[in-house]
């Protein structure tokens, strides 16, 4: 992934504008100019969509809550994605990361302050609370802004040890340190509230949405009093098993990190000068001590996450009492058929007997029961299907959905993506994250995931329409394209089943999921 950082300043004399009276406009050079609360920015126009990238929304010292960015003079050029939060991954060059300059967001809009109040959709990237960025091509907001006449926003924020290290034992100055990564997102939402009208958006109609870790962040925001009133609808995609830490565990982990570095709580200020890689090393050692050996394949920084401290974050998301501060928020939630499961679709000649032999290693004498329940849920199953179904995300989603409707009367919709990608000879199934390019209507930007079949484009058109309609009205129904999408109830489990033929299903897999992972 290649990111460009360009924070050049253009003098006012070149543009011939007065900062004090700068209304949104387009220069003779086709540069859209907007005055924000912190300064004037210029962007670009891409196929009729006004685009601003790398817009500063905050600044912060290490482990401190975010503050407003310093105001700037002149016009700040915002035409390239900003730096990425510090993280250790193989697919992002470290030169593209910056601990100080990561606090930026991106905006795509069809018009600037034209009197219309467009719905705003703010995307939170995946990667747990550990990795990721807002600059993934498949989450480019142009297609949604163009198709749905909405304002799209995406945001970078602090991650892993820099975003979620609990130093509360070191004094009141650090009492919020365990949650500063999420407070960054709250700060971005405040920026939206204060500025989005200049970009043609409605600050009173903001939908937050995200997948995987991004979905977990959506659920976390729903439990944060500071975020109350800053968003009005929410979409959680494959995010209901992203748990935060208890206050006791996060505090113990923070002290373990200090111990690894040979620093006492009284010497906490020394953390400000320790290189990031040394912090990560100490963090990994501390996680090992607190959690035990890292499971093979789990993220390096697995263990740093927000802390349910009862103040910044009231409780564990997706547990009883979930989102008591946002019971009035319309919500949409869903998963994919296979998620992160290793699939057997490449084994074209797999027989039912061979599949059953493997299943017996998992279910023993209950294997026939599993197959019977699977057949009830998916009558047209193949032997490969039996070995490939998600057994983690879907059960948690059903459990969360049941609790949500018991505790909230706000509209609540559930979806399930069963459509299998045609890439790699259809061997990947309906995998984790496949709903992202479909919901963004970005098949052309992620053909290595979706393929380029007519079915992929058709489904992307339908799903993106549903996401857009939900952002506009709180109702995802797409008249003439989908059967009626009813709100979820425990009794019927109404779920929109996205496939080559879309349909509304009713508790189609509840018994199967309860067998795999008891839903109570």
Please annotate each region the language model reported.
Residues 18-21:
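C-terminal motif of bacterial Sec signal peptides marking the signal peptidase cleavage site
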Residues 126, 180-184, 212-215:
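Active-site loop->helix "elbow" adjoining a glycine-rich segment at hydrolase catalytic centers
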Residues 91, 194, 228, 237-355, ...:
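Substrate-access "cap/lid" subdomains that shape
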Residues 215-227:
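Short glycine-enriched nucleophile-adjacent loop
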Residues 55, 395-520:
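Mobile gating loops/cap/lid regions near enzyme active sites that modulate substrate access
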Residues 102, 175-197, 255-256:
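Alpha/beta-hydrolase active-site loop
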Residues 199-211:
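Alpha/beta-hydrolase fold nucleophile elbow
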Residues 23-179, 203, 300, 340, ...:
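Non-catalytic accessory segments of hydrolases
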């Amino acid at each position: 992934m290649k990111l460009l950082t360009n924070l050049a300043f253009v003098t006012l004399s070149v543009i011939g504008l007065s900062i004090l009276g700068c209304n949104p406009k387009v220069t003779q050079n086709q540069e859209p100019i907007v005055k924000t609360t912190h300064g004037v920015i210029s962007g670009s126009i891409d196929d009729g969509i006004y685009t601003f990238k790398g817009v500063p929304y905050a600044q912060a010292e290490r482990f401190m809550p975010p503050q407003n960015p310093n105001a700037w003079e002149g016009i700040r050029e915002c035409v390239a994605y900003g730096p990425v939060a510090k993280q250790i991954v193989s697919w992002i060059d470290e030169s593209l990361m910056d601990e100080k300059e990561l606090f930026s967001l991106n905006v795509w809009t069809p018009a600037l302050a034209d009197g219309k109040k467009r719905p705003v959709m703010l995307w939170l990237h995946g990667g747990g609370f550990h990795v990721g960025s807002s600059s993934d091509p498949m989450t480019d907001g142009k297609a949604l802004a163009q198709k749905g006449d909405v304002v799209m926003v995406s945001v970078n924020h602090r991650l892993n040890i820099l975003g979620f290290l609990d130093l509360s034992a070191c004094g009141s100055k650090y009492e919020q340190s365990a949650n500063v990564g999420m407070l960054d997102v709250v700060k971005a939402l405040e920026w939206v509230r204060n500025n989005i009208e200049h970009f043609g958006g409605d600050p009173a109609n903001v939908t937050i949405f995200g997948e995987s870790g991004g979905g977990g962040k959506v659920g976390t925001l729903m439990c944060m009093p500071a975020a109350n009133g800053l968003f009005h609808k929410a979409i959680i995609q494959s995010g209901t098993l992203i748990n935060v830490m208890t206050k006791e565990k996060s505090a113990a982990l923070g002290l373990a990190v200090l111990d690894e570095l040979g620093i006492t709580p009284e010497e906490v200020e020394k953390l400000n000068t320790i290189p990031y890689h040394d912090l990560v090393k100490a963090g990994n050692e501390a996680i090992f001590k607190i959690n035990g050996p890292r499971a093979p394949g789990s993220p390096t920084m697995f263990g740093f996450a927000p802390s349910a401290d009862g103040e910044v974050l009231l409780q564990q998301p997706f547990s009883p009492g979930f989102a008591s501060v946002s019971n009035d928020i319309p919500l949409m939630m869903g998963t994919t058929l296979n998620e992160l499961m290793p699939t057997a679709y490449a084994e074209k000649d797999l027989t039912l007997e061979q599949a059953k032999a493997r299943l017996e290693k998992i279910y023993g004498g209950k294997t026939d029961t599993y197959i019977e329940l699977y057949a009830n849920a998916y009558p047209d199953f193949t032997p490969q299907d039996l070995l490939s179904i998600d057994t983690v995300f879907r059960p948690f989603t059903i459990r969360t959905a049941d609790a949500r409707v018991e505790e909230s009367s706000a509209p609540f919709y559930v979806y399930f993506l069963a459509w299998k990608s045609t890439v790699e000879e259809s061997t990947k199934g309906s995998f984790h994250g496949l709903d992202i390019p479909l919901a963004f209507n970005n098949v052309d930007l992620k053909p290595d995931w979706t393929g380029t079949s007519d079915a992929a484009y058709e489904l992307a058109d339908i799903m993106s329409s549903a996401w857009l309609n939900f952002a506009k009205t709180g109702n995802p129904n797409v008249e003439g394209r989908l059967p009626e999408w009813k709100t979820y109830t425990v009794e019927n489990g109404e779920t929109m089943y996205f496939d080559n033929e879309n349909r509304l299903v009713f508790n189609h897999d509840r018994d199967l999921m309860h067998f795999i992972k008891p839903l109570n």
